[in-house]
Structures are given as C-alpha cells and as structure tokens.
Amino acid sequence: MNFEKFTTKLQEALNEAQSLAVAKDNAYIEPVHLLYALVKQQDGAIAPLFTTLNVSTQTLINELELILNQLPQVTGTTTQASQQLIRLLNQTAKLAQQFNDSFISSELFLLAALDDHGSLGKLFKAFGLTKENVTQAISQMRGGESVNNQNAEQTRQALQKYTIDLTERAKTGKLDPVIGRDEEIRRTVQVLQRRTKNNPVLIGEPGVGKTAIVEGLAQRIVNGEVPEGLKNKRVLSLDMGALIAGAKYRGEFEERLKAVLNELAKEEGQVILFIDEIHTMVGAGKTDGAMDAGNLLKPSLARGELHCVGATTLDEYRQYIEKDAALERRFQKVLVDEPSVEDTIAILRGLKERYEIHHHVQITDPAIVAAATLSHRYISDRQLPDKAIDLIDEAASSLRMEIDSKPEPLDKLERRIIQLKLERQALQKEKDEASRQRLAKLDEEMTAKAQEYSALEEVWKAEKSALLGTQHLKTELENARIAMDQAKRADNFEKMSELQYGTIPALEKQLQDAIKREEENNDHHLLRTKVTEEEIAEVLSKATGIPITKMMEGEKEKLLRMEQVLHSRVIGQNEAVEAVANAILRSRAGLADPNKPIGSFLFLGPTGVGKTELSKTLANFLFDDENAIVRIDMSEFMEKHSVSRLVGAPPGYVGYEQGGYLTEAVRRRPYSVVLLDEVEKAHPDVFNILLQVLDDGRLTDGQGRTVDFRNTVVIMTSNLGAHLIQENAEITYLAMKEMVMSVVSQHFRPEFINRIDETVVFHPLDQQHIRAIANIQLQRLIRRLAERGYQVTISDTALDHISQAGFDSLFGARPLKRAIQQELENPLAQQILSGKLLPNNPVIIDYQDNHIIAKQ
C-alpha cells in the first residue's frame, strides 16, 4: 500500500497508533489503535464528525480505552500492522476511488470501519452508527468537495476554525451594548448594501470605538433592526492569530486563507467578514515570491463575493493601505471621530450595568460624568471613550480589591491581638508581682479587643453577604433579560411572556427591596461599595501625578502656608514669592485658565539672589522632592540647530526615535516645574517654540505628538539688566522694574514677553539677607554633623563673621558657600580627623582672635 497517498492527518494518526501499540506492549497495530489516535487528534476530521453524529467524543474515548486495555500484551517483539487493519485500509482506498478523491482521508477509514466484525463494529452498533448516516455526515462536512491534496483535512470548516461569530456572541449577550454611533453604523450599512465595492473600512484613532461599531452592527442584525438586504446575515471576525499560527511550510498560510475565501464564496453573501487591524493583511504571509494576504483578497473584494468590513487607525491606513492603490479602491472609507464628552457620558451610562455586575460595586452617575470630563481634560494622548472607560474600570477594580481584602480597622485589631498574645507568652514566664499585674491587665485588654474584633467581624460579614446578595440578583436579572431577547428572536412567546411578566418583575422587585434595605441600614462603615467622583480622581491622580482629588483640610492649610514656607528658604524676594504662590493657589482653587500652564514667570536679577533656589523650593513644596523639576540649561542651546534637541529631531535625522529633552520630560511627568535656566543665552529661535507653550499649554514634538504643558509651572531665569539692578538698588521696585524691562524688551520679542504671566525682578541681597541665608546654610551643616554624632551650636559672633566674609553685593549668596567652606568646614574637618573633636559631646563654634574656633 502506498502511504504517500494518505492525507497528512491520516499519516500522523498511523504514526501515533504505532507509538500507542508500542507503549501498551501490543504485538499488532489494531484498527482500535488508529481510531483512538484519530479521535484524539487536534484539528482532525474525526472528532467533528462524531459531534455531527451526536456521539460524545469523551464517551467514545473511554470505550476505546477499555477495548485497548483488553488487548493481549507481548514483550520483546516488533510491532506490526494487523491483518484486520490492512484489510480496512485497503477498503478505505477503494472508498476514496468511489468518492473521486486523489488522496485517502481519515473520515473514509471510519466508513470502512463500520464493516469491522470485531469489538469496533460492536461499539459502532451500540452508538447507532450506520453507513447511511455516516456517509451523510461526511458529505455535509466536505461541502461537496473532493480530497485533492494532502492537507485537505486542515482546510475544512475554515470559517469555524479561523473566525469568531459575532452574531452568535450577540445572541448570547456576550457583547457589550453599543450606545450612539448611529451615523457611523448607518454609513457602514449603506456601503454594505452596494452592489460592488461593498466593503467599508472604519478609520479612526485608537480607542474611539471602531470595533464597537461592528459589534453594534452584529447586535442590530440579531435584533432585525437592519434593511432587508442585511437581515439574517452573520458577522464573522477573522482571527489572524489562528490563521498564521502553526503555518510552518510555504504556502500553508495562503492555503488556509484561500479555504476561508472559498467557504465565504459558497455562503453567497450571507456572511460579512470583519477584519480588525486590516493593515496586518498587507504583507501577511509574504515570503520570497509568495503572494501576501492583501493580494489574495483583491479578486474576491472586486467581484463582490466577499462582504468585508475593515478597521484600522489613520496612520496605519496611510502607511499600508494607501500605498496599495488597487486594494484601497476596493474599500470605502468610514471615518470614526472621537465622541464628545456628552456622547461619552451616554456610552458610559449604557456600559455601567456590565461593570457593576463584573466588579460587584455600584457606579454612581457623578463618577461617570467625572470620568468623561476629567479624562478629556487631563489625558491628552489617548481618545474618548476608551480612556474614560479605563478610569471607571480601574476605580471599580480598586474598590473591589478593598471589599475582598480585610478592612483596615479589622486588620489593625488582629495585629494588636497577635502582639498582645506574644506579650502574654513572655510575661507568663515571669514570677514577680509587677509582671502578674501586667498579665492581668493584658488579659483584660485581650478580652476587650477580642470582643471588639468579633463584633466588627460580624458587621463586616453581614455587609459582605448583603452586597453579594444584591450582586447575585443583578446577575440573575441580566441573564433573564438575555433569555427574554433570545425567546423573542425564537418567537417563543410562552417563555417570553413568562420572563417578561413573571421572572423579570419579581427579580426587579427583589433587587429594589435589597437596595432599599441597604440604604436604610446605610452604616457601611467598613466597606465602600460606591464608585464616586473621588475614586475616579484618585485613579487619575495616581496615573498622571496631577493633584485632582478634592483637597483635604491638611492640604488646604499647607497651601495657605505656602508663602511662609517659600520665604523660609528664599530670603529677601517678597514680590517673587508672592507671584509664584498666587499662581499655584489660583490653579488649585480651580480659577486658572485650563488651557494655559499653571503659571509662566520670567525671573530677572543678578547672579546668586535666589532665582533658581525659588524654583527648587517650589518643586520641593509641591512634590516633596527637590528633584521633581525639569531643568534645562539654555546655555546648551546657543546654536540654531540645537533647537531640535528640545522637541526631538525631525524625520530622517539621527535620534528621531529618541524624542526631545523638554517634550519627553514633560510627557513622563505632566505635573512639574519646568525651569529654563539662563534663558537669554539661548538662540532667539528657541523662543519661537516656547510661544505655543506659554499661550496654549501645548507643544508638538518631532514625531507629531502633542505634549500637554497645562499642568506645569514654567519658570525662566535671566541675568538681563543685572547691572542696572546693582547700580540702582536704592530706587523703588517699580522704577527699577521699568528700567530692567527696557533692556529685556530689546533682547526678547514683544510676542514672547506678552505671553509671560509675570516678569519678576529680584532685589540684590544686603548684609541682613546674607546673614539670614548664612543661618539657613549653617543649620544644614549642623544637621549633617548631627547624623555623625556631633551636637554643634554656633555663636552669634561666628555667624556675623561668616556672613560678613561671604558678603559680596555683586555675586549675591554664592560667595557665602565658599566662605563657610574656608572659614568653618576646612578647620572642622581637620579637627574631626585628628581626634580633637569627639562624637557624642557638645561642640561650640565661636569667633575669637580673628578666626573661628571649635571647642568641646
């Protein structure tokens, strides 16, 4: 017998049957071995055939295993095919000729095995299999095709293997409801109704709901809410992963796709094929000289044999499909825009129930409104409704996590009880009177805590069971509604009326009663079961770092103390501190323009007066981290070409993928202080890109992405006009500001200066300011020494000397650091290393005989 004439699947099954016979020490490979291998085979033809014949494959496998275990076992012999198996295979070859097959397939072996006179024949009789019903099932499975290649079995029932039936999922209620999008669905239906080129392609940004539109179409078809031409059609989604997975050899992928297209052609327009991410079809399966999937689709699309709905993003459509003009002309574009905030709220209200059932929590309407509005305002790089749905989902998930875990009061009590038990064990070993008294007190506390714990646990369990009861009713009600829809479609009026007038009203009443009871006993002091706008804001704050949550009393107090905190570190610059503090207060009170940065400032003044220090102090105040500052030294951007480093190199240049210094930093940390240091040293062209940041709070980077600057504080520092400030230190602040601004307006363009919220001129520092700064810096030194065990106090005379030594009206506070190093740190370091100063002893630093001394 020529084994080359067997299909691939039958050859694999024969090899498997031989392995099985060897494993079970059987001398011969019997027909039962082969049938067992065929039934267990993945993607084989036999298992689906038995399903068609209403025979349980699991029952059949169990029966076959019983027969296999009864076969005689022999050791030390070579396994060979039995006469009975050879006879059946010959019979199968004859049947293949009768069916006009070029290759011998697995299902014909089943037909031949019906003539078996042994245990297999008896088994088939027990299952009620006859030649007539098996032949009929084979014809149904083959769909009128003969076996003309070795892989014929793999390409059968291609639609079942490589597609997902969306209409079936809509019937069983597995698809989420689709709210709105009527215009897009109507346009899609309009294109599908055409005679030729009836293939719409949905194009839109990621997350706007392209796939949801097709799901909405499937739901409308199921409910009969479509024109006559689309009624009773099926919407199948092509599973590209299943189509490509396991296609090892050249041509196998094309074979599978061709099988799908052939089956679709046989359906004669009764199937609408949905290809999500349709751009993946262009180039899919393309190897040297092979056709890609896109070219295989073209003839079917042009002839109208294939009703296809595609979905892809704008960028990918341009990149892949527009390049192939022949493929593009076969599709009709349907643009899917981002829904408005109002439409998003409607969509979320429709989805609310599904998410409530999944997470077992209640989602309030203010939470839905907050999710739509806050995500629209604060998440700029993604689209509605996807980003709003994500917020609802995550907020509900975090609440569900809290419900499932032990509440904090219970957890604290449990830990305290464990702590008391450990203490009790230790005290039991002691015999003295004090320990006994302590033990008695401990027992009293333990009893009280245990009672408190059990009472709280009862409350928690009662709350949890009430919550689970409500959720169970919601799930039952949802299932009853799905069952009613199915009964309506099947014209089962008896079941429909039973559900509509009996089951559903009863469940609704039970649910209302349960919710009413919950509200009456509304003392949920352990479990939070409602998603409110606060939970939404909390999730968004964690994701973006922008403080959106309602301000707690502590934060309000902190903000009102803001000027005081800034003054404690930035000395002698009242106007600057006030301007910055007011900008932050306006923003957190919700009064600032939402389309501009929180504040944009130009700090002018001589070197070393606190311009950069104020920026650092602000970052430290807002984020408790001095490094939460995007600092860019503008002296690095002196050449014209270096401007691109801020926003990223243009396409075609090295470093295009890396993004810009400024844009990438703000994308990663949208709520931050942006410090552009020494701004006058940058090339004038740099200020052109800052115009849109200061005006609209946005900047487009080299890759075309819009970066949101609306939650940043933009601070620019400059030394322009510093000489005027030094020379005219005695005149009024306003007069000095006017003089400095005349110099600034000569250097910067009017449109740049006009966009800055406030230009702040810093005063030169006098002796008193330097003394206060010296005190701050010396306190830092004292803290560093305290960490090493030295308790240091500095006398007023020493402080006066250091502040005088570090005072220079031209250079501000910077010489002070050098003075502290030379006058104090250097001699201190020598004395510590030489052992003259010992830790854990008080150290007094004083000024005597024209130099600073440290004594213990």
Curated annotation (Swiss-Prot):
Amino acids binding ATP 2: 605-612
Residue segments, region Linker: 339-545
Subcellular location: Cytoplasm
Residue segments, region Repeat 1: 6-71
Binding site for ATP 1: 204-211
Cytoplasm keyword on record: yes
GO cellular component, one term: cytoplasm
Principal location class: cytoplasm
Pfam entry (one): AAA_2
InterPro entries: AAA+_ATPase, ATPase_AAA_core, Chaperonin_ClpB, Clp_ATPase_C, Clp_N_dom_sf, Clp_R_dom, ClpA/B, ClpA/B_CS1
GO MF, one annotated term: ATP binding
Domain notes: The Clp repeat (R) domain probably functions as a substrate-discriminating domain, recruiting aggregated proteins to the ClpB hexamer and/or stabilizing bound proteins. The NBD2 domain is responsible for oligomerization, whereas the NBD1 domain stabilizes the hexamer probably in an ATP-dependent manner. The movement of the coiled-coil domain is essential for ClpB ability to rescue proteins from an aggregated state, probably by pulling apart large aggregated proteins, which are bound between the coiled-coils motifs of adjacent ClpB subunits in the functional hexamer.
Subunit structure: Homohexamer. The oligomerization is ATP-dependent.
Family, as annotated: Belongs to the ClpA/ClpB family.
Protein name: Chaperone protein ClpB
Species whose genome carries this gene: Haemophilus ducreyi (strain 35000HP / ATCC 700724)
Gene responsible for this protein: clpB
